[in-house]
Design a protein with these regions (language model features):
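Conserved hydrophobic beta-strand within the GNAT/NAT acetyltransferase core sheet
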Residues: 118-121, 245, 279-283
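Flexible, substrate/cofactor-facing loop regions flanked by secondary structure
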Residues: 159-243
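Conserved donor-binding loop and adjoining core beta-sheet/short helix segment
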Residues: 21-26, 30-101, 218, 222-248
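Acyl-donor-binding surface of acyltransferase catalytic domains
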Residues: 86-159, 298-310
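Short hairpin/turn module used for nucleic-acid contact or packing/dimerization
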Residues: 256, 263-310
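A short beta-loop-alpha structural element at the N-terminal edge
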Residues: 1-16, 25-29, 161-176, 181
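Conserved acetyl-CoA-binding loop-helix of GNAT-fold acetyltransferases
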Residues: 93-108, 250, 256-269, 273
Length: 310
């Protein structure tokens, strides 16, 4: 096996390999939308951070990553990077070996640039890719899931009010957003978030970059919310027929009473009426509350894994 820096002349072949990998995942998750081509593969040739693998002068895989950033993945002071779904691919034969050899070369590139942590989004049903990275010290951090925009069951809490919150009323649920942040700070999530970062996030979500649906009790108090956006964490989430959940919270005293399930049903029925066909969600796999809830109604299609290089 030989290796070259991923260049523009390799992009179309890399795109074909990436598309084959996506089609494999679609066999396991038929809800995934059809695509003609994998977008933005050229980024990993343009930034000089990609590696291509060859057997007998035929490309068998590639691996790239985004430009690094500081304080990545809550490792304060560390420079880290991420390889998205469109940033890698490998043929089926010898896939474990191909990915492991690619990572060896990619890690050398990263270390030379001072990049000390590396994350990559893998397809959830690609056992060979997961084996390759798990054996090399990676652990799961996040997951993306998808479902058809179809009912999950009749609303049980008929006494609750389900509605879309107007932008001017977003401050009503600021405390719930802060409670969600506090939940993610605790064990076993331990996601770091400074007061400044929290303030910036609240300003962003209250600026109108999303739609927010809420469940209200008989006293008018908001018991739960779900944020919806038109953008996902990967190219799949940008499909025009798809909408994505980007934040969910239910006050603790009303958990286990089908409040969040009923709100999700309301959201699904609303979006279906508007013509949307797919619903996605991403979450930290270190959040057991999210893990238990979302897997009941959604199917995994990605598994994002992370490790420190040095």
């Amino acid at each position: 096996m030989t290796f070259k820096k991923l260049s523009k002349e390799h992009v179309e072949e890399a795109r074909k390999i990436a598309l084959c990998n996506y089609e494999e995942e679609r066999l396991a998750v038929p809800e995934l939308p059809a695509v003609d081509s994998i977008p933005m593969v050229e980024l990993f040739a343009e930034n000089g951070l990609g590696i291509a693998a060859f057997e007998n002068d035929k490309m068998v895989g590639f691996l790239g990553c985004f430009e690094p950033w500081i304080d990545a993945f809550d490792f304060l002071g560390d420079k880290g990077t991420f390889c998205p779904l469109m940033g890698h691919g490998a043929v089926k034969e010898n896939r474990v070996l191909i990915y492991q050899k690619l990572f060896e070369k990619e890690a050398e590139v990263c270390v030379a640039k001072g990049i000390s942590s590396f994350a990559i989004a893998l397809y959830a049903h690609d056992s060979e890719a997961k084996q390759a990275f798990f054996e090399y010290g990676f652990g799961q951090r996040c997951a993306d899931k998808i479902r058809p925009m179809e009912s999950i069951g009749e609303i049980k809490n008929k006494n609750l009010v389900f509605e879309e919150l107007e932008l001017s009323r977003f401050p009503e649920i600021r405390n719930l957003r802060i409670d969600l942040n506090n939940h993610l700070l605790k064990s076993p999530c331990f996601l770091k978030c400074s007061d400044e970062e929290l303030g910036d996030w609240l300003e962003k979500v209250e600026s109108g970059d999303r739609r927010t649906f809420v469940a209200r009790g008989t006293d008018g108090k908001v018991l739960a919310y779900i944020d919806i956006t038109g953008e996902g964490e990967n190219f799949v989430g940008y499909d025009k027929k798809m909408r994505n959940i980007h934040g969910t919270y239910c006050v603790p005293e009303f958990r286990g009473q089908n409040v969040i399930q009923d709100l999700l049903e309301h959201v699904i029925l609303t979006l279906k009426t508007e013509g949307f066909e797919l619903l996605g969600v991403d979450h930290e796999s270190t959040n057991p509350t999210a893990n238990r809830f979302w897997r009941k109604y959604f199917t995994d299609y990605t598994c994002s894994v992370l490790r420190k290089i040095f």
